[in-house]
Amino acid sequence: MILTITMNPSIDISYPLDVLNLDSVNRVTKVTKTAGGKGLNVTRVLKQLDADVLASGLLGGFFGDFIKNDLNINGIKHSFSDISGETRNCIAILHEGNQTEILESGPNISEKEANNFLRHFELLVDKANIISISGSLPLGISKDFYVKMLSICNKKDKRVVLDCSGEELRQVLKNDSKPFAIKPNIDELSDLLGVKVKDSIEDLKLILNTPMFNGIEWIVISMGAKGSFAKHNDKFYRVIIPKIQVVNPVGSGDSTIAGLTKGLNDGETDENVLKIANTLGMLNAQEHITGYVNMDNYKNLFEKIKVVEV
């Protein structure tokens, strides 16, 4: 079983408009509301791959119940830890080829609720083959919370695919409890290091060989239309992807994480792990809906991706 974790889930609301009129009334006829958050995007793609997946994290209030119901409708198993606060909304206004986002910060989690989740998480980890943890931490939870979760997983010899950035990732990298795999993009890597990272093979090799990344078996660097660069133990790979028509890139990183997690869980070769991950990321970018892939196009894209050891 694959366990996915979303610590700060949301209801993702999409408002498509021909024109956004500021300081005026804007009427929307077609509204889309889905269970959101990076980990739940990962979950939906894994479900489309027919993976045995269980979603967990923190949920509360009416909006938390909405998310549970949405997952039930889509046949996705879940086991969340309840909180007293209200799960957040994230609003995307699609207008004139632009996307304006209004993101609520979400509920403030108490120390008791955080500890309750850790106990719940430990029980779920026992049943999991691999764990995918994605996204930011909610208010009230310390930035080293992922370190605590990783410590639980490492003690049980369970692999973790971690997709986070900023201070959460810094805390992970400076501690002994490391994930099995991470997937920063070039901008997140630059923010982490405090310098502009170039996407040259030589520079990326030097960076990924620095001590801060010691103990992480897989590192995949997303480079958008340029594909990706990866390190697995002592091997480096350049992933070259075909040019595609991008419809909506939001959620492509989450789809890539789903593919990475699925490939690792299934014991695929290095080449196939990277091809699966990149194929799913591209498939998501070709859709209007976040966390959705059209598997009819999977084989065609998969066969066009090249993985070269460098």
Swiss-Prot record:
Keywords: ATP-binding, Kinase, Lactose metabolism, Nucleotide-binding, Transferase. InterPro entries: Carboh/pur_kinase_PfkB_CS (IPR002173), LacC (IPR005926), PfkB_dom (IPR011611), Ribokinase-like (IPR029056), Tagatose/fructose_Pkinase (IPR017583). Belongs to the carbohydrate kinase PfkB family. LacC subfamily. It is an enzyme of class 2 (transferase). The keyword rRNA processing does not apply. It comes from the Bacteria. One of its GO terms (biological process) is D-tagatose 6-phosphate catabolic process. The gene is lacC. The keyword Transferase applies. It catalyses: D-tagatofuranose 6-phosphate + ATP = D-tagatofuranose 1,6-bisphosphate + ADP + H(+). It holds the Pfam family PfkB. Its EC number is 2.7.1.144. Pathway: Carbohydrate metabolism; D-tagatose 6-phosphate degradation; D-glyceraldehyde 3-phosphate and glycerone phosphate from D-tagatose 6-phosphate: step 1/2. This is Tagatose-6-phosphate kinase. PROSITE patterns: PFKB_KINASES_2 (PS00584). GO terms for molecular function: ATP binding; phosphofructokinase activity; tagatose-6-phosphate kinase activity. SUPFAM superfamilies: Ribokinase-like (SSF53613).
